Swiss-Prot record:
Its main location: cytoplasm. It comes from Saccharophagus degradans (strain 2-40 / ATCC 43961 / DSM 17024). Gene3D superfamilies: Urease, gamma-like subunit. PANTHER family: UREASE (PTHR33569:SF1). CDD domains: Urease_gamma. Pfam families: Urease_gamma. It catalyses: urea + 2 H2O + H(+) = hydrogencarbonate + 2 NH4(+). GO terms for biological process: urea catabolic process. It is found in: Cytoplasm. Belongs to the urease gamma subunit family. GO terms for cellular component: cytoplasm. This is Urease subunit gamma. Keywords: Cytoplasm, Hydrolase.
Length: 100
């Protein structure tokens, strides 16, 4: 299987998000990369499902709570930017204050 660098990045992100999802389900608090991956994957999958940028900006804020991440992680993540593929092209989605 031949993948270009962008496809490899998406696959790596998705794999990290799956790991984060499993850890969260077990009650393990997520670290910085896991939190970013889980929020990013939610945005990317939502774009693929046809949601709008505005819907995804809000959906990205619903993924994690402060209780889901290690101490200090919520304070470190002020925004998450994801380049997502929509039916009408690629757009940059910014989720502000994603962990509430």
């Amino acid at each position: 299987m031949e993948l270009n660098p962008r496809e490899k990045d998406k696959l790596l992100l998705f794999t990290a998000a799956l790991l984060a999802e499993r850890r969260k389900a077990r009650g393990v608090k997520l670290n910085y990369p896991e939190a970013i991956a889980l929020i990013s994957a939610e945005v990317m999958e939502g774009a693929r499902d046809g949601k709008t940028v505005a819907e995804l900006m809000e959906a990205g804020r619903q993924v994690l709570r402060v209780e889901d991440v290690m101490d200090g992680i919520a304070d470190m993540i002020h925004e998450v930017q994801v380049e997502a593929t929509f039916p009408d092209g690629t757009k940059l989605v910014t989720v502000h204050n994603p962990i509430v």
